[in-house]
Amino acid sequence: MPLFVAKRTLPGITPAALMSAGVRAKTCCAEMTQEGESVRWVRSFFLPSTEQSHCYFDAASKLAVEEANQRARVPFDEVIEVIEMTPDMV
């Protein structure tokens, strides 16, 4: 399944708000999968110095990732398909 990143700018976000957004995203992904639209939140990284977040999703399409984030009320700047590379792959 393709891997996507949802890039976000989250000025002033608190740790509690980040956790709440994660709970909503996880719930919405599970609901969409149950409805037949496979989307799974893999992990997120928050960059405090730039107030940016990169959230990774396995999904059938970019639109599925956008819909999951919209349902979860988690804003995003853009969703981009990525190619994963790990040290074990090289």
Show where each model-derived region lies.
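Amphipathic, hydrophobic secondary-structure cores in small proteins
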Residues: V42-F57, V65
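Short amphipathic alpha-helical patches
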Residues: C29, Q52, D77-V79, D88-M89
